[in-house]
Amino acid sequence: MICLIVSSLNNTPVGLHGELFKEETIKQIADIMKKKEIEYGHEIYLLSDEPYRELIYSEEKYPFVTNYYDNSLVVYSFSKSLSLPGERIGYILVSNGCKNKEDVYAAIKGAGRTMGFVCATSLFQPLIPKCLGVTSDLSVYKKNRDILYEGLSKIGYEAVYPEGAFYLFVKALENDAKKFSEVAKQYELLLVPSDSFGLEGYVRISYCVSTKQIIDSLPIFEKLYKYYNK
């Protein structure tokens, strides 16, 4: 058995930069995996990590991978959609079309018992059914995104325009994103270098804070920009 884990590549909106995977992309991934299953002569399982599924700013909906590939599993967390970071509550969905699904389901249950620290608390288990379909106020995220993206672009920064999630992926003002992040700390700006995600030269900024914080940060980002463009 081979298990192909596609997490940050196949969650959408992508947690790294907030872009959406289109249906055609999902179809291409599914087609490749089906061909490889035939080539290798056994199942390949696709694990799709989707904690940001509801955090989309348009009417566009992300296609479920289970509709395109039978041997797929979907991992979901309510911590993002309900803005409850750190709460260990979510689910793993095993496709009805998944081969050996009973064995896969049993393995998941066994892993949950073995790693007790990931078990859902008794407090949240009865609450979650009441939260299905509910999300945080996305209008706040959308407003923050627009203010931050437009503000940084006006200053001179280059950034990926996010279609979902709550992160802005910004090109660092020098090749070394880690060093750039250290310099930003001197201006009381906390940035996450993209090296941690396997891509160099960018930083990630979370905008799930108050709108006032976003507005107040722009003059500081401008000072940082001027430091690099003396």
Task: Give the ranges of each region predicted by the language model.
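PLP-dependent class I/II
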Residues: M1-K230
